[in-house]
């Protein structure tokens, strides 16, 4: 029996950065050779979700959403477009397993810590997990808080807090939420796209990877979704789904 993995993402007709992490992690998984086949599919790019399974030769396929949290796309769009009816669907003689998104897995906390350390975080620093936030999807907020709690449980940093782009507590107030002299802010986003690369730095008036304000320092990390160790999270999701 051939085992395959299908990574699905949103994609964009306007920005290649949107799909770049999906392709990146697919390449990593292929190089590792853990699975017989690794494919990709998108909502806004080719190959489309509606035809993604057609490209798979494997008999047992695990579909992994490259999204930060569960919501409209993972709960409705992906299953509808791919004809999935639950965690396990049998389609044209194939067994298709559908996992939760990578961003909701507990192992993502290790990726957040890694991103912070890459940005120069030290044990005495504060870490701020930065989420998008949206009133349309309360699970988005809940997932950010859950990841921050998991990061705090690792015990690597003096303080761990949560901030958002589009809701309270707002990222602009990050210094008032912690007492540490240095704060490392890690974006809980999949891609280094428009928000991570433009709107957040502009709204925060960041000077670059490091910004100094009133004797304090803010370090801005790269998005968690582009970290190479996301491939480890994907493998863990596939391993868990194989027991279904």
Model-based region annotation:
Residues 1-244:
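Active-site-proximal alpha-helix that buttresses catalytic centers in soluble enzyme cores
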């Amino acid at each position: 029996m051939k085992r395959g993995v299908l990574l699905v993402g949103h994609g964009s007709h306007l920005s290649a950065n949107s799909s770049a992490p999906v392709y990146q992690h697919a390449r990593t998984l292929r190089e590792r050779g853990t699975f017989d086949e690794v494919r990709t599919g998108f909502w806004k790019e080719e190959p489309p979700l509606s035809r993604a399974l057609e490209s798979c030769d494997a008999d047992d396929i695990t579909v992994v959403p490259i999204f930060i949290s569960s919501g409209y796309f993972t709960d409705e769009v992906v299953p509808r477009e791919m004809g999935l009816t639950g965690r396990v669907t049998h389609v044209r003689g194939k067994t298709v397993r559908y996992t939760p998104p990578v961003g909701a897995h507990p192992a993502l906390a290790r990726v957040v810590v890694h991103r912070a350390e890459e940005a120069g975080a030290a044990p005495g620093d504060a870490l701020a997990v930065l989420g998008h936030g949206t009133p349309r999807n309360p699970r988005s907020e809940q997932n950010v808080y859950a990841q921050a709690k998991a990061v705090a449980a690792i015990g690597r940093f003096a303080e761990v807090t949560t901030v958002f782009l589009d809701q309270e507590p707002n990222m602009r107030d990050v210094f008032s939420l912690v007492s540490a002299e240095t704060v490392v802010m890690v974006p809980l986003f999949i891609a280094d796209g428009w928000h991570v690369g433009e709107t957040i730095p502009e709204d925060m008036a960041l000077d670059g990877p490091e910004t100094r304000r009133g004797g304090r320092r803010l370090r801005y990390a790269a998005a968690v979704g582009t970290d190479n160790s996301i491939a480890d999270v994907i493998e863990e999701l596939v391993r868990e789904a194989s027991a279904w």
